[in-house]
Amino acid sequence: MNKKKKPFLGMPAPLGYVPGLGRGATGFTTRSDIGPARDANDPVDDRHAPPGKRTVGDQMKKNQAADDDDEDLNDTNYDEFNGYAGSLFSSGPYEKDDEEADAIYAALDKRMDERRKERREQREKEEIEKYRMERPKIQQQFSDLKRKLAEVTEEEWLSIPEVGDARNKRQRNPRYEKLTPVPDSFFAKHLQTGENHTSVDPRQTQFGGLNTPYPGGLNTPYPGGMTPGLMTPGTGELDMRKIGQARNTLMDMRLSQVSDSVSGQTVVDPKGYLTDLNSMIPTHGGDINDIKKARLLLKSVRETNPHHPPAWIASARLEEVTGKLQVARNLIMKGTEMCPKSEDVWLEAARLQPGDTAKAVVAQAVRHLPQSVRIYIRAAELETDIRAKKRVLRKALEHVPNSVRLWKAAVELEEPEDARIMLSRAVECCPTSVELWLALARLETYENARKVLNKARENIPTDRHIWITAAKLEEANGNTQMVEKIIDRAITSLRANGVEINREQWIQDAEECDRAGSVATCQAVMRAVIGIGIEEEDRKHTWMEDADSCVAHNALECARAIYAYALQVFPSKKSVWLRAAYFEKNHGTRESLEALLQRAVAHCPKAEVLWLMGAKSKWLAGDVPAARSILALAFQANPNSEEIWLAAVKLESENNEYERARRLLAKARSSAPTARVFMKSVKLEWVLGNISAAQELCEEALRHYEDFPKLWMMKGQIEEQGELMEKAREAYNQGLKKCPHSTPLWLLLSRLEEKIGQLTRARAILEKSRLKNPKNPGLWLESVRLEYRAGLKNIANTLMAKALQECPNSGILWSEAVFLEARPQRKTKSVDALKKCEHDPHVLLAVAKLFWSERKITKAREWFHRTVKIDSDLGDAWAFFYKFELQHGTEEQQEEVRKRCENAEPRHGELWCAVSKDITNWQRKIGEILVLVAARIKNTF
């Protein structure tokens, strides 16, 4: 026995010995080493513990509180200024006075912070700007050099040598990873040696999508599936042909899953595959558990109250949305048994059942509910044959003869003659139905229709539509004198029967009459109700708004009636006559406009604009003598009117009656010597070539009106035309002394200096003009263009930046700034311009030109339309629009733009005025000027 005893047993362990360390074991502690777990309610070992400390939970709370009370109050957590990092009294209670003290200190801190906030922020901003100036970004340092890259030619670009690579060869030529397909011999070798084997995942079989290998959903494979007969590798060579066939078969299976077997088109989007899967889930809006809960809840409702129809309907619809249509049908049929008097249950049953079965269900419903209109309507809808529909509806009318809905449905299926007979019976059964009475009146003859409408008024004395239909009937048969009487009687009768006259409803009825062609009726309705319910001081404003509303709704006769009534009430109001005249000009005929203007000048003889509109209408129609006679009458009513004098002069000069024009101007200068009369006198002599007479008249005019800048401009331009540059400069300088705030004078003087080559002097003139006229966009724009024409693009860009700082909301500056940028930056600049000047026509025109330059034709056309809609007086916009249509539009589009421009009669625009005010074009029409301006435009932007 001693021989078998191990020699180390009973001996002390060597120093540092850890049992089990050699075989990898580690020390651990078990529950038996530390004792069983103790509940918080277990008593502690100390039986004499005071109350509050006798359980394990009380001891744990005490220890935790003791840990929380240990605050870090050593020197490392102390600061001389702030004290301890934590609060010395954090363990104390936070009372209301503590909260009040904290609020006071917070308010003091906030106040101290705001005292020098602006100064501090300004100082920080200046420091940042100074830092950026001293240390600019690399991009800013090379910005001027980058602009010069635009001047580099293509040959210079190609001649730039390639940048060398200073790295070593291995870094310069990295070895790319090469992927080589595994050869077939590799598979054959390992197949023969049996080192590897492959198997087909059961989830990839023809039952694709199942998580189990057998369609029955069992968790075990079918018998023999895991035996060596199937899952072990075979012996022999690999048959690559069979592998290829298997791969093709698998591909066909997958394609068949995502393809339409009928049309062959793919119906599953690979990118949205998961979304498509979600869409296949029934749209009940909940998961399976929610459906089960709802099903149980509805079952409980049905069992508790089996005669409650909504429970059966809800149960059937729940089964329907979950895809169990037959269960839904069974439920709803059971519901019809339990609730045979519920109309909704029968209709739901008819909806869920297929065609023939639905007819049987409806027939059964009719037996239980012979008075249900909805069931009869549903029965008619289920029939496909017209005769069957008629038969169903007639049967329904036998049971429910007072149903308007059934009568209407039945009448719609009949021929006119049968419908008339049926409606005669319908109005007897439903005498309070306005629609049936009106339908019968439409099918009857004139005499019978009058009788029908009279009966309708007797049965329904409170409906306005019967009266309006009667008025339309009389108008359609030529009795227009009866229309006014019928509408007046309608208002009286309705009021007598306690009906409140709703003005808005009657106006809508009048607009419907207008659209139907019943002009007399709509005008009579308007005259009858236009003044109802309006305060006397609000009448004019309200009526003008009503007229605008009618025009917007394309009810022109209603608007004409409103204007006619307003002119009767306000015959001496020039504004009403003017709006009516503009309405006739835009929507009426020339004859109606002239007739209105004749009445207008009779009531408002002092309204010059009305006289001028009448004369212009006659002149445009080619009736010059009539225009002269109108102006003669205008002279009698307004003997010293400047506008009428100038209109008469224009009429004579446009018709080549220059001597008449001279005599008229001479009379005007003697009787009404205004600055404009003198200006027109000078211009007439100038355009006729009488330069000396023009200069004499100009000198005479300046003696009377030296502060009228246009006279100084004309004097300088006449001298400039004669190549007398010194005299022209002197005229401009004298004019600027008298009119220092005239922008055109500054521009003319600057361009004169530029024309004779004095660029420095032109620049100085513009700088001086900007000092005397700060925040003037026109002067800034000319300064920018001056530098750009001189080739100093950098200075031009700098000036543009300053201009936009001084005039940040100037559309004309922003439009110029867009095209000062290089092409890639123009779009960004245009966005900035639109943010600053969203509704400025110059900015909109710049955006349209930008789209034009990018060949975005549709967008460009859209923005041109916006531009001319916002400001139709801007001739440049029309010229660019016309040029655009000449290049990209059809003849119809070009003609439309030209006609719209002629109707708008634009007067402003830089390019437009340069052509229209040229003395060689003084007799040209708007359309001719449009063509000339468009010809000058070169789309090099």
UniProtKB/Swiss-Prot annotation:
- Any one Pfam family here would be PRP1_N
Using the record's annotations, give every residue carrying the modification Phosphothreonine. Answer: 180, 266, 275
Q: Name one GO cellular component term.
A: nucleus
Task: Say if the entry is tagged with keyword rRNA-binding.
Answer: no
This protein's UniProt keywords: mRNA processing, mRNA splicing, Nucleus, Phosphoprotein, Repeat, Spliceosome
> From which residue to which does any coiled coil extend?
none
Concerning PTM, the database record says: Phosphorylated by PRP4K during spliceosome assembly.
| InterPro entries membership | HAT (IPR003107), PRP1_N (IPR010491), Syf1-like (IPR045075), TPR-like_helical_dom_sf (IPR011990), TPR_rpt (IPR019734)
The membrane spanning regions, by residue number, are none
Biological-process GO terms, alphabetical? mRNA splicing, via spliceosome; positive regulation of transcription by RNA polymerase II; RNA localization; spliceosomal tri-snRNP complex assembly
Describe, as the record does, how this protein assembles with itself and its partners: Identified in the spliceosome B complex. Identified in the spliceosome C complex. Associates with the U5 snRNP particle. Component of the U4/U6-U5 tri-snRNP complex composed of the U4, U6 and U5 snRNAs and at least PRPF3, PRPF4, PRPF6, PRPF8, PRPF31, SNRNP200, TXNL4A, SNRNP40, DDX23, CD2BP2, PPIH, SNU13, EFTUD2, SART1 and USP39, LSm proteins LSm2-8 and Sm proteins. Interacts with ARAF1. Interacts with AR and NR3C1, but not ESR1, independently of the presence of hormones. Interacts with USH1G.
Please give the PANTHER family that the UniProt record associates with this protein: PRE-MRNA SPLICING FACTOR, PRE-MRNA-PROCESSING FACTOR 6
UniProt function note: Involved in pre-mRNA splicing as component of the U4/U6-U5 tri-snRNP complex, one of the building blocks of the spliceosome. Enhances dihydrotestosterone-induced transactivation activity of AR, as well as dexamethasone-induced transactivation activity of NR3C1, but does not affect estrogen-induced transactivation.
Protein known as: Pre-mRNA-processing factor 6
Q: Which organism is it from?
A: Mus musculus
